[in-house]
């Protein structure tokens, strides 16, 4: 079904889907439309093969570091003379003055700090205004015990992005092949999560074209997968047996008219069946949807549009918009360890929900119909929850309902 209509990399399949624009240059190449924010649909595998055919034989696919050109000693002297002549001509000075400028202001004169000097210590005898402002700011922080959170999120984001940059695998068998495609995927917040849902990607993940859809599905981290079902006011010490991800394993991706369902486990259900039946019930004009197994398809097998919103659904009704923002060939500066992909490079930073009592620690419990709480629902850390709701013997005080709470900020 889906294998026959979407799995093949042949460029001829595209002709059945759309009329190629005169400037396309090839049916596997993504075509940008000026009035739209996304490309037209194209086959990922065919696009990658077309790209590799254009570059093959030119050395552009190599993942080896380009060697630094060796400069003979005689050429260095000649280059210095030419540089002196150019500087003398631009500045209107003599060759001797240009040579002196090169000796005094050359790159070899740029030095780091002296051995043992601490870059965090501001010297006393400085007349720089910026250092004076910095010193007063640091003194103010010590006096008021304030926490500087300026740019904390962006610093963390760039730290994640650079963590695996240029990393090589220890096992040569895990090396990414030359010409491999890398796709950038933005995972947005669940639709029911109102804050940031329209403009803040929840996660940005890099996936390889040869990886299966199930690998991306397992890499997406959502707080709804970690929820613990049940009411624990009478047994707060009881360890939960399962989290939602262990109980409800069904999920699907939706790309270009096809639902790719996760069917790896016997308990997995076809979550797309309800949507397909609703679409076909009154001829709603959506066309005929297809279904396929997520574990049977790689990203190279897909038809996609760059910049177009697709869907990832799990836990029955937790829906994430998925946007593929970029597709490119792997470069020698990328992470070349296949085992690290799908690679998380950006993650939105969230404020954690604090305990209502101490205002310090992250909430671990949420209560309803609580006679000890000023609001409903009310959030508590583990220590405050037990001190307020149980006696020294661990017996329950009063009437309330208690549920384990997983804070989204724990993913920071």
UniProtKB/Swiss-Prot annotation:
It comes from Bos taurus (Bovine). Its main location: nucleus. Part of the SNAPc complex required for the transcription of both RNA polymerase II and III small-nuclear RNA genes. Binds to the proximal sequence element (PSE), a non-TATA-box basal promoter element common to these 2 types of genes. Recruits TBP and BRF2 to the U6 snRNA TATA box. Residues 1-10 have a biased composition (Gly residues). Pfam families: SNAPC3 (PF12251). GO terms for biological process: snRNA transcription by RNA polymerase II; snRNA transcription by RNA polymerase III. Keywords: DNA-binding, Nucleus, Transcription, Transcription regulation. It is found in: Nucleus. GO terms for cellular component: nucleus; snRNA-activating protein complex. InterPro entries: snRNA-activating_su3. This is snRNA-activating protein complex subunit 3. The keyword RNA-binding does not apply. One of its GO terms (molecular function) is RNA polymerase III type 3 promoter sequence-specific DNA binding. Part of the SNAPc complex composed of 5 subunits: SNAPC1, SNAPC2, SNAPC3, SNAPC4 and SNAPC5. SNAPC3 interacts with SNAPC1. Belongs to the SNAPC3/SRD2 family. The keyword Transcription applies.
